[in-house]
Amino acid sequence: MTKKIVFMGTPFFAVPILKSLYEKNYIIPAVYTQPPKKSQRGQKINKSPIQIVAEDYNIDCRTPDTLKTNKEEYEYLKQLDLDLVIVVAYGQIIPKEYLNLAKKGFINIHASLLPKWRGAAPIQRSIMNLEKETGISIMKIGEKLDTGPVGNIYRIKIKDSDNAETISTKLSILASEKIIENVENIFEDKLTFKEQDDTSATYASKIEKSEGEIKWNDNAESIIGKINGLYPSPGAFFIFKDERYKILKAELGNKSGEIGEVMSNDLEISCGNQKSIKIIEIQRQGKKPQNINEFVLGSQIIKGSRITNV
């Protein structure tokens, strides 16, 4: 392949897509990713998954703090004479002036069915809002976040057993399987991009840790959505006797009682719509994850306990 493509991405989600492009032998003169971050204790520098892969492939990996007002990176990209730039969960806004630096523009792979769930956390928000399906949208990058015209949408079902981790994996694999045919169609001018319907747009704002706290007066289905949508991080949690408990996996139960009441020793907890959730896997603050059978052996949370943070 003689076409030159720059790839911009950061998390594991983006890795299979970069691998697909590399294995197709496109010329990839550079990869952009977020700068390495220090660990919490400051002893280790953690590179992004994309940086690790790019270095393994001996691709020039560039990690600017920002592209905005960054003349050096602008000039670098300009001199590459690019055909296309592909962006997958890069984590930075692409400045308007960059968008003319590639002959076929900047293409973004977004993890939602646009115009639904524009923004930073589409996978989490779709699960938390009890959507039955999600997917990926292949779109042109415009001046505003996730508003550009869409070329293709690919859908998958969200199963009851899914969480943000499993859906992320499924969508990443799906994108890696679909990217080559879309890139080739872009180069051959065979892919038609259609403007989004802004009136149908919803927004997937960044997840805040505080959102993970479970309100037991919510309905049981919404609580399950929160648990699944926030797994593995930051996680859904409750406070009992000043200790935090993260619920890693749960399912709908069949008991009802007072809001926040523990209905059985294996932690079936009553919710706000006369339904309950059954905890399957849980993690006590500072401890390792446990399945519920292990957890209840030494737990202070027993039948008749009341979790009152509603």
UniProtKB/Swiss-Prot annotation:
Q: Name one GO molecular function term.
A: methionyl-tRNA formyltransferase activity
Pfam name, any one: Formyl_trans_N
Q: Does the keyword RNA-binding apply?
A: no
Q: Which key words are in the record? A: Protein biosynthesis, Transferase
Per the UniProt record, which EC number(s) apply here?
2.1.2.9
- For this protein, what reaction is catalysed? L-methionyl-tRNA(fMet) + (6R)-10-formyltetrahydrofolate = N-formyl-L-methionyl-tRNA(fMet) + (6S)-5,6,7,8-tetrahydrofolate + H(+)
Q: Name one GO cellular component term.
A: cytosol
Gene3D superfamilies referenced in this protein's UniProt entry, alphabetically: 3.40.50.12230
Residues reported to bind (6S)-5,6,7,8-tetrahydrofolate:
S112, L113, L114, P115
Assigned protein family: Belongs to the Fmt family.
Q: Give the function comment from the record.
A: Attaches a formyl group to the free amino group of methionyl-tRNA(fMet). The formyl group appears to play a dual role in the initiator identity of N-formylmethionyl-tRNA by promoting its recognition by IF2 and preventing the misappropriation of this tRNA by the elongation apparatus.
Q: What is this protein called?
A: Methionyl-tRNA formyltransferase
User: Which species expresses this protein natively?
Assistant: Pelagibacter ubique (strain HTCC1062)
Q: Which gene encodes it?
A: fmt
